[in-house]
């Protein structure tokens, strides 16, 4: 009971960090596994994002995926449902000309500014941010916070990988 009362007393001050949201050009983690019906029901709900915090919490990095030109894939869920349900999502297949493009942004909380990293090297590359390992109790309801690998907010370690997976660069920004 005390914990519930404490949660209700917490004041949350939300700050909108971006104003450039667009369907299929997202900061959110992919929501594969949801049927189209469920996706429509949950349209206004918040989605998990790919955010990596600096250990000093002064900055965070986000990965944004641009799938506006990617083609859709359809999956029919027919096993556990009385009637088949459709799941539609963007998926890059071998040979596709238009595939997901990725960006890394660094958000500075003190200045409320966003630095878009110039990371382009390989055509249709994949990217990722190196993060530290975190222990998490399976029954914990605490939000998961991914922390980037560097000791402070002055450096960010990331990788870029060619689409054919033959080349990988380890980078620092």
Describe the residue ranges of each PLM region.
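Predominantly five- to eight-bladed beta-propeller fold
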Residues: 3-52, 62-120
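Extracytoplasmic beta-rich repeat domains
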Residues: 24-34, 123-143
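Blade-terminus and WD-like Trp-Asp/Gly-His loop motifs, strongest in beta-propeller folds
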Residues: 45-46, 50-59, 131, 140-141, ...
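Catalytic cores of secreted or luminal carbohydrate-active enzymes
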Residues: 61-64, 147, 162
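Short glycine/acidic-enriched loop and turn motifs that connect beta-strands
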Residues: 67-70, 162-166
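A short catalytic or substrate-binding loop motif that flags glycine-/basic-rich loops and adjacent residues
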Residues: 96-98, 140, 163-164
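A detector of repeated loop/turn-to-beta-strand junctions in beta-rich toroidal repeat architectures
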Residues: 101, 167-169
């Amino acid at each position: 009971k005390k914990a519930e009362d404490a949660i209700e007393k917490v004041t949350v001050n939300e700050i909108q960090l971006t104003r450039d949201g667009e369907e299929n050009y997202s900061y959110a983690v992919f929501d594969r596994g949801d049927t189209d019906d469920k996706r429509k029901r949950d349209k206004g709900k918040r989605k998990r994002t790919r955010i990596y915090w600096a250990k000093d919490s002064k900055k965070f990095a986000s990965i944004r995926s641009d799938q506006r030109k990617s083609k859709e894939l359809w999956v029919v869920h027919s096993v556990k449902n009385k009637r088949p349900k459709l799941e539609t999502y963007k998926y890059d297949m071998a040979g596709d000309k238009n595939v997901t493009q990725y960006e890394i942004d660094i958000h500075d909380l003190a200045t409320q500014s966003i630095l878009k990293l110039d990371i382009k090297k390989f055509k249709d590359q994949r990217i990722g941010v190196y993060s530290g390992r975190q222990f998490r109790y399976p029954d914990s309801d605490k939000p998961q916070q991914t922390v980037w690998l560097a000791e402070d907010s002055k450096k960010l370690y990331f990788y870029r990988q060619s689409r054919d997976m033959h080349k990988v660069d380890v980078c620092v920004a």
